[in-house]
Design a protein with these regions (language model features):
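Short, basic/aromatic recognition patches that contact phosphate-bearing ligands
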Residues: 1-71
């Protein structure tokens, strides 16, 4: 499996499970820079916006200082 695809699936699963996605932590975990994680976040957001039956949104939560999934 492509590293990027595996990383996006892993990030997706983490946010679906209720985890707060902090870019710096994710970048360190996967050995990439924060820009790569931001692109992954954008891909996950695009997935949710292209699914007409999904009311989910991945958005930044200032209080939690990371990205969370809103239903």
């Amino acid at each position: 499996m492509d590293k990027k695809v595996g990383r996006i699936i892993s990030l997706y699963n983490r946010v679906v499970d209720g985890e707060v996605l902090v870019k710096a932590d994710a970048a360190a975990r996967y050995g990439v820079n924060e820009k790569s994680i931001q692109r992954d976040i954008n891909d996950i957001r695009a997935y949710f916006s292209n699914d007409p039956e999904s009311n989910r949104e991945l958005a930044y939560d200032r209080r939690k200082k990371g990205y969370v999934l809103f239903n």
